[in-house]
Amino acid sequence: MLTHLDSQGRANMVDVTEKAVTSREATAEAVVRMRPETLQLIQDGGHPKGDVFAVARIAGIQAAKRTHELIPLCHPLLLTSVKVELQAEAPDAVRIRARCRLAGQTGVEMEALTAASVAALTIYDMCKAVDRGMLIEQVQLLEKLGGKSGHYRKEEEGQA
């Protein structure tokens, strides 16, 4: 059942008024593939626009806080923690992990996914002058904790 549709099939924001406040957490990731020279430029700190990872981290945090303004049926949330980590993966990728937490009545999956996505887009924006062929991939929810649906963890490749 799609919870964002009413009985007539119209889009609406889910009413969470009666839901209990519980601890909730979600982790998402995105991967940016690029030329090895682009990754080296980022790692060497030689990018003319500045520290690519620092700017992408701040962009991801900011995006998580503004998810409800970007995705129409998301609730505005009082996030208690947003962490965005970026890891260079030689020879040609950056892996972004975003984790969002709160005590609330609805989950934070969209906030984590938005944080990872916008951090990836920021890397693209900062590096497009030297590498227009970058690829953003594997935007996905890795783990979700809390709420009525319980615990979800993406299975590793090759697991049943």
Curated annotation (Swiss-Prot):
Q: Which UniProt keywords apply?
A: Lyase, Molybdenum cofactor biosynthesis
Any one Gene Ontology molecular-function term assigned to this protein's record: cyclic pyranopterin monophosphate synthase activity
Keyword Zinc part of the UniProt annotation: no
Q: Which reaction does it catalyse?
A: (8S)-3',8-cyclo-7,8-dihydroguanosine 5'-triphosphate = cyclic pyranopterin phosphate + diphosphate
> Keyword Lyase, does the record have it?
yes
Q: In which pathway does it act?
A: Cofactor biosynthesis; molybdopterin biosynthesis
EC number of this enzyme: 4.6.1.17
Alphabetical list of HAMAP family matching this protein: MoaC_B
Functionally, this protein is described as follows: Catalyzes the conversion of (8S)-3',8-cyclo-7,8-dihydroguanosine 5'-triphosphate to cyclic pyranopterin monophosphate (cPMP).
* Binding partners and assembly: Homohexamer; trimer of dimers.
Say which family it is in: Belongs to the MoaC family.
What protein does this entry describe? Cyclic pyranopterin monophosphate synthase
